[in-house]
Amino acid sequence: MNPSAESPSSIHTDCAEVQVPGQVFLVIAVASLSENLLVIVAVIKNKNLHSPMYCFICNLAVFNTISSFSKALENILLLFKDAGRLNSRGPFELKIDDIMDSLLCMCFLGSIFSILAIAVDRYISIFHALRYHMLMTMRRVLIILFTIWVLCGTSGALMVGFFEAATVKIFFIVLFFTALLLILLLYVHMFLLARHHANRIASMPGAQAQHRKSGLRGALTLTILIGVFVACWAPFSLHLLIMMICPENPYCECYRSLFQLHVVLLVSHAVIDPAIYAFRSVELRNTYKKMLLSSASRICKRCA
Amino acid sequence: MPRFQLSNSTSVPNHNYEWSYEYYDDEEPVSFEGLKAHRYSIVIGFWVGLAVFVIFMFFVLTLLTKTGAPHPEAAEPYEKRMRLTSCADGLGRQRETDGRTGLSRPLLEESRSLFHCYINEEEREGGRAATDAGALTHGRSGIGNSRGQVEEVGLVVQNMVLESRAEREAALLAHFNIPNFVNSELNSALGDEDLLLGDPPIIMEEARPRCTHHIID
């Protein structure tokens, strides 16, 4: 970018790119890493959580862990570069940059697919409750997870390799909108069934008034789930769309100047995910309590 | 894109080429002159649209909560539920004495017997379950009435436990805490919609293959 070539009048009306300090990324990445590692450890340790639903939640946590790890690594390397210890144009650094970008890409795709898998799994468990264990055997779950990993790995590598092509951006945008639509449909249908049953219970004599409060709570949970998904992924998808459609429009330029903020939102999705999916489970929370108690008792034994 | 100019005198090739690269910014700088609307209008429009979408979705879901009309056949399923609760009552009393062991074997035995009790109740029901099966299974009647009954029982079992959360002792709920299954969220204080977003409800694996084969065959 050659600032001297710009006309003076355009400088102060330009939408300068909003820079987010690297420390913010680092803090978010470290928080996400610790949360998701906790989820993975809890799911592995507790035998009760070796079921299809928790496999998908653990898979989401693994993708989030890898993405936050690579984001943290990228920021550390940027700090080194700012300190002058790294050459930003060297071949080794470019290769590392490509590898980290493809890992990030793979993890973003993987989180979308994992969220979809969790929604489909919940849907099957509600609407085909009695056939659930025939439909979702552990073998099928492992096959699904393997497919997701292979698909995301190759897509991530291809997307970073051919990022200039418009196909990559179109693929990402289409994937986001499809996932959003599917999640909306599945969860709203599940919600409608739950309302139907709650109304039938409420119509019985002796029903309590907590029925309405629980309905509001369900609506709130669903809104948070879908709202967080859209708020974290839509800005980035719109950014890709705008890059393709209007690269020279000043309004679009102002939107594109907020790129780093949109990436912050993407990374913060990895922080919020455990709170929405994993930590809502009572069994997982009990596992944490047991882990804390056992480690506390071990420390006490060493002290005494 | 490189741009080069040939010198005017072509008779003497003195190679007066001028190379320069053109950046898009130099050629067509994004002009911010004369913008009609605010420069961040796309950003503002996007976030306002997103907020409107989320709030609209919340209001729609809340309205669905409030305006759920009572089911016209409310009396009949109530009786059926009372009959089915008798199954759970009998077994619950039996198991209260055992206490809350948390062992898988006795729990599976009891869930098997509970399931058989429900299936027997359903079979005794006869043809009355047609409308209810249709309502509960949402039009999957093509599969067959008995299958619909089985699925209806599954859903009614879900309802049962929803109900029992408020009324029964925790011992009955522990009945459904079958290890290696997705644990039921229903013994927590979450709302019944969180049923969707917590763990799936009662899945009785050992009992089901035998029972469904018995019903479907």
Swiss-Prot record, chain B:
Q: List the disulfide bonds.
A: none
Name the domain of life this protein comes from.
Answer: Eukaryota
InterPro entries in the cross-refs: MRAP
Membrane topology reported for the UniProt record: Single-pass membrane protein
Example GO biological process: energy reserve metabolic process
What residues bear carbohydrate chains?
Answer: N8
Q: Which residues span the membrane?
A: 42-62
Which keywords does this chain's UniProt record carry? Cell membrane, Endoplasmic reticulum, Glycoprotein, Membrane, Transmembrane, Transmembrane helix
Q: Name one GO cellular component term.
A: plasma membrane
Q: Which molecular function GO terms apply here? A: corticotropin hormone receptor binding; signaling receptor regulator activity; type 1 melanocortin receptor binding; type 3 melanocortin receptor binding; type 4 melanocortin receptor binding; type 5 melanocortin receptor binding
Q: Where in the cell is it found?
A: Cell membrane; Endoplasmic reticulum membrane
Return the Pfam families for the record: MRAP
Question: What's this chain's function?
Answer: Inhibitor of melanocortin receptor 4 (mc4r), a receptor involved in energy homeostasis. Plays a role during larval development in the control of energy homeostasis and body weight regulation by decreasing ligand-sensitivity of mc4r and mc4r-mediated generation of cAMP, leading to stimulate growth during larval development. Acts by stabilizing an inactive conformation of mc4r during embryonic development, when all the energy consumed is obtained from the yolk sac, possibly to speed the rapid maturation to the mobile free-feeding juvenile stage reached at 5 dpf.
Assembly, per entry: Interacts with mc4r.
Any remaining note in the record?
Two paralogs of MRAP2 are present in zebrafish: mrap2a, which plays a role during larval development and mrap2b, which constitutes the ortholog of mammalian MRAP2.
Sequence similarity? Belongs to the MRAP family.
| The protein's name in its UniProt record | Melanocortin-2 receptor accessory protein 2A
The organism named in the record is: Danio rerio
Identify the taxonomic lineage of the organism of origin.
Answer: Eukaryota, Metazoa, Chordata, Craniata, Vertebrata
